[in-house]
Swiss-Prot record:
Its job: Biosynthesis of L-glutamate from L-aspartate or L-cysteine. Important regulator of levels of glutamate, the major excitatory neurotransmitter of the vertebrate central nervous system. Acts as a scavenger of glutamate in brain neuroprotection. The aspartate aminotransferase activity is involved in hepatic glucose synthesis during development and in adipocyte glyceroneogenesis. Using L-cysteine as substrate, regulates levels of mercaptopyruvate, an important source of hydrogen sulfide. Mercaptopyruvate is converted into H(2)S via the action of 3-mercaptopyruvate sulfurtransferase (3MST).
Modified residues (N6-(pyridoxal phosphate)lysine): K259
Name of the gene this protein is made from: GOT1
Leading EC class: transferase
Lineage: Eukaryota, Metazoa, Chordata, Craniata, Vertebrata
Note: In eukaryotes there are cytoplasmic, mitochondrial and chloroplastic isozymes.
Protein name (record): Aspartate aminotransferase, cytoplasmic
Catalytic reactions on record: L-aspartate + 2-oxoglutarate = oxaloacetate + L-glutamate; L-cysteine + 2-oxoglutarate = 2-oxo-3-sulfanylpropanoate + L-glutamate; (2S)-2-aminobutanoate + 2-oxoglutarate = 2-oxobutanoate + L-glutamate; 3-sulfino-L-alanine + 2-oxoglutarate = 3-sulfinopyruvate + L-glutamate
Any one Gene Ontology cellular component term annotated for this protein: axon terminus
Phosphoserine, modified sites: S149
GO MF entry, a single one: L-cysteine transaminase activity
Record CDD domains: AAT_like
Residues that bind L-aspartate: G39, W141, N195, R387
NCBIfam families in the record: PRK09257.1
Keywords: Amino-acid biosynthesis, Aminotransferase, Cytoplasm, Phosphoprotein, Pyridoxal phosphate, Transferase
Amino acid sequence: MAPPSVFAEVPQAQPVLVFKLTADFREDPDPRKVNLGVGAYRTDDCHPWVLPVVKKVEQKIANDNSLNHEYLPILGLAEFRSCASRLALGDDSPALKEKRVGGVQSLGGTGALRIGADFLARWYNGTNNKNTPVYVSSPTWENHNAVFSAAGFKDIRSYRYWDAEKRGLDLQGFLNDLENAPEFSIVVLHACAHNPTGIDPTPEQWKQIASVMKHRFLFPFFDSAYQGFASGNLERDAWAIRYFVSEGFEFFCAQSFSKNFGLYNERVGNLTVVGKEPESILQVLSQMEKIVRITWSNPPAQGARIVASTLSNPELFEEWTGNVKTMADRILTMRSELRARLEALKTPGTWNHITDQIGMFSFTGLNPKQVEYLVNEKHIYLLPSGRINVSGLTTKNLDYVATSIHEAVTKIQ
């Protein structure tokens, strides 16, 4: 008799919530259905948007007979890496001028986080540092915990961030938790458009955060998934990163070009490394090369070529910033419109937090039972946390969504 399958005892894993939500939405035959769960930009017709500048550059690449499908270097396309790091740090960055910056092309922002986490687990402040505490915001993007756990970190903690009562930043709690963190802890920071809350510190608050991190010798690991996409302004969205450079920090910054280029399925990311001197950057990159080699070996070229071609050409760069502003402005408009409708309906509670927040997501303050009502009764799909993708709102569904939220809040406590 043949033995049972070697896979017979494998337990069924829970589906990834945000992707299951989209699958449920697709299968729902109700014509009123609205998807506010997906983490991607949508037009006012609820369609994905291929940026006009991306179409133009793709055509240019297709017509370039000098290009081929040879392997890229392990660390990626050199022009892409330098352009990406420059976008985050700014043309006049002292770190760039002093040649103490390195970049690693990665598979999206998640890949950049993972390469950085793997490196830190092996080499941060010595060797084998899996017991170093890693701090993530409460709440945070769920993959932050998963990536650092998978890299072997055993002590993942949260710092206070969201004040549910005020529906804003718990700055004092944030600062207190940093103050009490063991020296040399790693702190994951959202560079802009915090996911899922949409609440960002002001420049003055960032200064306070940096001050505490400096005297506690804490290591910043920025996650920059929305530069330009948050406010429509590339410089404003990179303010915190550039301030930390000016304060002399060494840090990592995971960059994603999924949102601001609309290149979701091309997996275009970059890990920017800022050190104290050029020599240490070369040493760090040499070890990261080893990690990449056993992880994905070589990155794909197409998305990196699109981004590098755009960022290195002044005309295309200007067109791209216009495309990004189009997306950011539509989201800002949808925020204002949703708030206005809820206030006109006299929906219980305050709704100014919707316009105080920034970026693609809004933490509505809806509780899990209210969310359940919206999903089951109104066919409006959103995460149990109450997070919505604001770009899922359109001029056609705004009234329906607002009245449905009003019903949920009024009927269900």
